[in-house]
Each structure stands twice: as C-alpha cells, then as structure tokens.
Curated annotation (Swiss-Prot):
Keyword Ribosomal protein: yes
Protein name as catalogued: Large ribosomal subunit protein uL16
HAMAP family to which the protein is assigned, alphabetical: Ribosomal_uL16
Alphabetically ordered keywords of this record: Ribonucleoprotein, Ribosomal protein, RNA-binding, rRNA-binding, tRNA-binding
GO biological process terms held by the UniProt record: translation
Any one of the GO CC terms: cytosolic large ribosomal subunit
Listed transmembrane segments: none
Length: 136
C-alpha cells in the first residue's frame, strides 16, 4: 500500500477539505476516472480500485495512479479514555476535491476502459465520472 517513506511530522491536524482540485485534465493516458464528489481516499481504497482495473484489462495497456495518500489519520485504541495525548497513526489518506483525475489508462479500447473504471468506481467512497483526453 502507498504511504510516504518519511515525513517532516508524524501527525497532522484534521483540517478541512475545501476548494477545487488541481490535476483536472487527463495528461498521461487517453481515458481517466474523475472525482465528482469530495472526500478522503485511503491507501487501501486506492489499491483496491487499482486491482479491480488491472484484473479487468488483463495486462493490456498502462495504468497511472494520479493520487497519493500523504495525510496520516490517527485513532485511539478501543476502550481508552479521552486525554493522554493524540492517538497513533492508523492509516494514510489522500484528500480529493471535485474535478481531480485519480486514475488514467492508455492502450486499451474505450469500452474496456469504461468497464474497468466502472469496477474501480465501486471501490471508491464518492461519485466519479469517465473522461477522455481533449485533443487540441
């Protein structure tokens, strides 16, 4: 699963997930999966969607993952009283804003790419849409 090799700080504050995304255009592949909603994408969800796509396209073409989980999420253990400091880092997330292209694929027919992205979208916690590269 994806996570940073090293970070400046072990834990971060919760923060908010506002604004519009960068990386809204398909830049590496021909087809992309774009977020319509906003939310957190865990490293496990990123990997589950990647596996679903890879299994469907069966080693044809190439897949790019355009998101990286760089925010640590902490949790306290079960049945522990409040206080006594912040909990331990349990998992990593990528903050996703509307318009972000999360996955791209190239070298496969459009029907195959659509079905692969449909399977991947089932693993994600918000709505997505299929996009194609704009040719100038």
């Amino acid at each position: 699963m994806l996570q940073p090799k090293r970070t400046k700080f072990r834990k971060v504050q919760t923060g908010r997930n506002r604004g519009l995304a960068k990386g809204t255009e398909v830049s590496f592949g021909t087809f992309g999966l774009k977020a319509v909603g906003r939310g957190r994408l865990t490293a496990r969800q990123i990997e589950a969607a990647r596996r679903a796509m890879t299994r469907h396209i069966k080693r044809q073409g190439k897949i790019w993952i355009r998101v990286f989980p760089d925010k640590p999420i902490t949790e306290k253990p079960l049945e522990v009283r409040q206080g006594k400091g912040k909990g331990n880092v349990e998992y990593w997330v990528a903050q996703i804003q509307p318009g972000k292209v999360m996955y791209e694929v190239d070298g496969v027919p459009e029907e195959l790419a659509r079905e692969a992205f449909r399977l991947a979208a089932r693993k994600l916690p918000f709505k997505t849409t299929f996009v194609t590269k704009q040719v100038m």
